[in-house]
Amino acid sequence: MILYFHGFDATSPGNHEKMRQLQFVDPDVRLISYSTLHPKYDMQYLLNEVSRQLTQSDDPAPLAIGVGLGGYWAERIGFLNGLKTVMINPNLHPEDNMLGKIDRPEEYADIASKCVSQFREKHKGRGMCILSRQDEVHDNQAVASILAPFYPIVWDEEQRHKFPSLAAHLAEIKAFKEQQ
């Protein structure tokens, strides 16, 4: 089972396309949707929703995958649920770069301060990060410098921030999911 966390643009048709592509990794791909506007409520909702999805699956190695803001959530919710995680162009600091787009960006800082201390160290080896060199939204060199001590970084030379085509990385994602 793959739990797919969409990015900030929740209604983008690209989400359906990415989920369709991920079916080459695992036929059971489930959308984990959230409001994108109210982070404090999203955190509790996502924890409950992922827990519910996990009880409805017999997959011994479910995978959380998120793009952009979904990468932020996939990393945290994946860690808290003991899931392997793939982050694609993750937004690591929505409290800084979502000003004017969401109602309470400061809630992301609050969530970060309440998350398990040094959670990346504790999640080391259970995540993988795919970063685009053509990301027009985030400085992925900075993202890589933060995440590289904890997760392998896979660079993509062509995709933009929303990463419409996962095709070049599906084999890597599948191998990561199946790796013990």
From Swiss-Prot:
Database matches in InterPro entries: AB_hydrolase_fold, UPF0227, UPF0227/Esterase_YqiA
Coiled coil regions, renumbered to chain: none
Protein family per UniProt: Belongs to the UPF0227 family.
NCBIfam families noted in UniProt: PRK04940.1
Name of the protein in question: UPF0227 protein Shew_1627
Organism: Shewanella loihica (strain ATCC BAA-1088 / PV-4)
